[in-house]
Amino acid sequence: MKETNCIRLGSTREVCWDMHFIENCEGVRLQMHKPVRKNTVLTCDKPWEGSTCGYISLLKVGDVFRMYYRAANAMLIDSLEKKVEKEGPDFTGCSEAGKISICLAESKDGKTFTRAKICKFDILGEKENNAVFRDEEEVIDNFSIFYDENPDCPSEEKFKALRYTEGPEENHLAYYKSPDGIDFTFERILPIAGKFDTFNVTLWDKKTEQYFLYTRDYHKPDGRTTPRCEVDLVHDIRDIRVSTSKDFKTWEEHGQIDFGQDAEDIPLYTNGITKYFRSENIFWGLPVRYNDRLADKHNFKDLTLPGFDRYASLEKLGREASVVNDAVLITSRDGLHFDRTDEAFAASGPEDGSNWIYGDCYHAYGAFETEADFPGEANEMSLYAGRGYRTRPLEITRYTLRLDGFFSWSAPYSGGYVLTKPFTFDGDSLSINFATSAMGHVQILVCDETGNPIPGYDSGKVFGNSVDRTVEFENDLAQLAGKPVRLRFEMKDCELYSFVFEN
C-alpha cells in the first residue's frame, strides 16, 4: 500500500462525484446521472417579460424560495427583420423600448412560483409588478444575485449583485449591494479584467474563508487572451476566469479555470459555479457549451422554429440561427482546478418546434432541496432552466435529481470494490446515500491505515435505496473517531452517492 497523507474528513459529507477519495478500486466507475424534467414553475408572459427572460439566481431566505430573473422580450424573428433592414440584432425590441427588468418570483415549495408584489416601478403603465431593479439609461444584460454568508459582511451588503457594464475603452463588472434583496444600490466597479457579457457569479467559501468570482473572457485558439477591441464572436473562444478575495475589495486574478492539459478547448458560456449545499468540500457548475452547426445546415430544414423559415434565414441571422447549446457538469475541490464531463448533462430534448436553438440549456445559478412529489420518498434536488428562448414566452422549468446525485460510484452486477485513502472522522455513526437492486448490495468494512479490516466493523450486505441509511456495526464507531482509518466498499449492482460520519 503506497503512502498517502491522511485526509481530515471530520463530519463533512463526502460526495462520490470524483475519484479524489479513492486509493484503489476495481470494477467500479464514476457514473453521471441526468436530471428528470418535472414541471413549469413560471411562464414569463407578463407585458414586461417575454422570450428573452433568463439569467436566474436562486436564494433561500428563511422558508421562502426566491428566484430572480432577467425580464426581457426579443423574439428571434425580430432579429431577422432587423438583419433585413441592415441593422444588427439587439435588445431594442425588449420591454418598454429597451428597458430590461430584474424581477423576483417566490415559492413556498420550490415547485410553483408566483411573482412578488414589489411595486417599485411603473412599467408600461402598470405599477403592480415584480421588478426589483431597472436602469433608465443603460440596457441590463446580466444581473446575478447571491446571499453573502461571510459572518463579517455588513448587514447592508448581505445581498450582492454583479452586473456587466460597458465603458468607452473596456468592459466593467459593477457591484451592487442590498440589505434585503429588494433595493439595490451601486457600490463600486470591481478591479477585474474581462468581458463579462454573461452571467458572472460569486460566492463565499466557508472552508477557505474567501470569495470566489467566476467571470467571462475570450481567448484566441493559441491561448492568448483576446483584447476587447479584437473580439471575434465567431472564432474566439469564450472561457471562464476565476478570481479570489478576502474582503470583496482586493482581488487576485488566477486566469482561466483549469480543466487539465488534455481537455478540449471549447467555448463555454454561463458557468453557474457554486458550492454544494450539502458538502463544503466541493464546487459544481453547469456551463453551457456553444456549438455553431452551420457546417451541418441541412439539419435546420427539420429543426423548425415558429414565425420564419430557419433554414432559409441562416445566412441573414448567422450564429443566432445556427448555434445550438447544451450544458456540461463540472466539479472541483479547490475552485481553481475542475473536472468536466464530455457527455452533456442536459441537452435540448425532444424537438418541439421551439428548441435546439441558441439559448437552450441555460440553468439557474444554484439549486434547492425540495420535497419529493410522492409521499414517503426522500427530499430531492431541484434545478431550473428556461425553455422556449427567443421563440415564445420563456417557461422556467424544474428538473430534479436525487440528493447528492450528480454522480455516483457505480458497480455492475458482476461486482467491484472501492478502498478509500486514509482519513480521520468525527462522530459515532456512518450514514450512506445508496441504491441497489434486489440482487445487489454494498458491504462496508472499516479498515486500518494499511487497509486491513478492523474486527467488529463489518456491516454485512446492505441493500435498499435510501439517501440516509445508518450503517450498523458490531462495535462502536466512536472508538475510531480521530484515528486514521479507511473504508472499503464492496459493491454489486449498486450506486453509492455519498457518505457522512455524524453524531
What do the PLM-derived regions correspond to, one by one?
Residues 1-503:
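Carbohydrate-active catalytic/glycan-binding domains of CAZyme proteins
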